[in-house]
Amino acid sequence: MDYKKAVYLLRPYDDYNAALAFMSADYNHSALDVLSRLDDTDPKVCYLKAMVLSRLGQQEEAQKYYRLCLAYDPYMRHRANLDPEMHLLVKQDNNNY
């Protein structure tokens, strides 16, 4: 998929899909900017924010959003276990239990 085209098309919407397009095109700072304006009580937003923060090397903040995601929807743990990019956050979380 052409993620840069998706960014171009979704940029005006400033929503979850726009953030996902930014992240997929490796525009992580732009993705985080959009996510910062979205609802932190949405587990999908928290999950994506955790992933972007992890990419940016902000592990403590990423862990915070990963745990928040799980608090809102425990099933997201299963999703994270299947996502190689979330491996470090899952491992850190498992070490804390």
Q: Each predicted region: which residue ranges?
A:
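TPR-repeat structural position
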Residues: 2-3, 28, 59
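Structural marker of alpha-solenoid helical repeat scaffolds
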Residues: 9-12, 38-41, 72
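Start-of-helix register in tetratricopeptide repeats
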Residues: 13, 44-47, 78-79
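Terminal, low-structured helical/coil segments at or just beyond the last alpha-helical repeat
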Residues: 71, 75-97
